[in-house]
Amino acid sequence: MIDRIDGSSHKPGDKMNVIAYGAYDRHNYGDLLFAIVLKHYLEADGRFRVLIAATKQSDLSSYGALPTIALKKALEATRQQDKTMLIVAGGECLTAQWESIIGYLAPQAIYYPIKASPYLIGHRQFIRLSRAFTSIPSDLPLVLGERELPGYQVMYNSVGGNEISRKKPLIHAAIERNLKDCTYVSVRDRETSAELDKLGVEHNLVPDSAVLISDIFPQQPEPSEPGHIVFHISDHHAKRRIEAIARQLTELSASTGLKIALLTIGKAPGHSDDEPLDKLQGLLGERAYRVNSGHIQDIIRCIATSRLYCGTSLHGAITALTYAVPQIALLPRRVVKLSSFLETWVPQQSCGFAEIEQISQTASALLTSFGEPQKAELQAMVELMKNRVRANLEHMTALYEQATTADEPATQSPTGNTTLFAAH
């Protein structure tokens, strides 16, 4: 449990420190976006100073990301505030487990031995060791509760967590316990919402906050550019499928006359894309080219100026969505978080779902049918989604301010705005 210092050093007019916590210390594109969005929007009116916290201190600024401090340091820096808002914002954080989080931070050579450790020494012992190693006061790395964080208001910003009910009883119980022990929960897709309904956890359904990234990094394609098709696949999903993918992409490029941009989106262990995409480049030759810097703005530019995105990355698809580019969820039955998000929020005529053997046919059909009317409809839907995300952020700050001024019980739904928190 984190001890607190009585009293407050806060003075009227001072900025209040807010902690944004997530997996921002590894190169996984989507996680890095959450920190940027929260800092941009929460600091906009001058009331808050956002501390970007993760499992450990890191500096991925060479990739366009925000540096992080360890959560332990962020808690130490905010102890003298009477109340501190701690926002958990990041992807599938509800089901992230210690072996994955610690594995991502380790050298590639020991990633898989770390992943196997809970099965060798037992999950309960591995949790104890992980808590001691990271000083994170929770049995799960990204699911925090207020019982072990007195004086903090823990809130969850449009997070994900599919298949909670299939987790081991020890993990399942920890998720339920901590989510019922926080101020506010919002989730980003119907699958996660259904899982929390089973647990009896009150929550709101809100789009992924990364849809706001186009407000922060506006993009305009050059009129002279013919456009391209973005393709992405993670190493895990590419195994034994490279040749079949190459055949599909060759056919797609030949039929459309468009080149294929093979885009690296993640470089962290467990999220690395370089190896399968390099192999595809070798097979596709002049029909394709690599975009592999890993820099956030290069990734955004590549997707925003494309004609179509096809891949296994959820935040590749969300980036396409927010710039009104049609999306194809690759391997939808395997990448549930991706297919679930698109099914929850995106108009059917603006997205597609494809197994490997369906890539060329699905992409060609979507490119043919996606015209100006469909683009206008998608842009309108994106604006509605952005409004819901902004309302969610405003609701969280309102809950915090209510608690700091009146110490009244917080409620889950924003007064007068409940319609903003239902999927279309």
Cite the ranges covered by each PLM segment.
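Active-site anion-handling motifs in enzyme catalytic cores
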Residues: 2-424
